[in-house]
Amino acid sequence: MTSEPMIISPEPGRRGRAVRGTTLVIGDWTAEGADREVAPLHVHHADDEGWHVVSGALRFRFTGRQVTAPAGATVLVPAGTPHTFGNAGPGPSRFIIILPARLDELISQLHASEPAEHPEIYRRYESELLE
């Protein structure tokens, strides 16, 4: 199997795009809304996840502590670490998210399902809702 590297040119004004390889996804996302968490506290038992804040600020909540990551900060959450995150301010925050392809699939399934289905979806991806 031959793989070719991808070079993605910037596209002004475009939001929410992702570059997907076989095992890694790099997404350019914007968090709208003031001080709102994206998901309940959860854990990915087998996968790391990372964010780089481009503008604005993100608030991360871990078991027992909270951290605000301003523009320019990079946050790596190792597998097995309970976490959630959200926009920390009144304006939008733009960030790059780096995650395994299967966590991107998990997120897609969550967005396409009802909340009652979420615990089972997390389990299928070696993840767990904690709240």
Q: Where are these predicted regions, by residue range?
A:
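Double-stranded beta-helix
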Residues: A88-E131
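Structural motif
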Residues: G50, A57-R59, Q66, P82, ...
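Short acidic-glycine-tyrosine-enriched beta hairpin
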Residues: G64-P82
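Short beta-strand His + acidic residue motifs that chelate non-heme Fe in jelly-roll/DSBH
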Residues: F60-R61, V77, H83-G89, R94-I97
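Short, charged/polar surface micro-motifs in flexible loops or helix N-caps
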Residues: T22-T23, A31-R36, A57, Q66, ...
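Hydrophobic/aromatic beta-strand elements that line small-molecule binding cavities or substrate pockets
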Residues: G27-A31, G50, G72-A73, H83-F85
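Short, conserved beta-strand element in jelly-roll/cupin
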Residues: D28-A31, V43-R61, I98
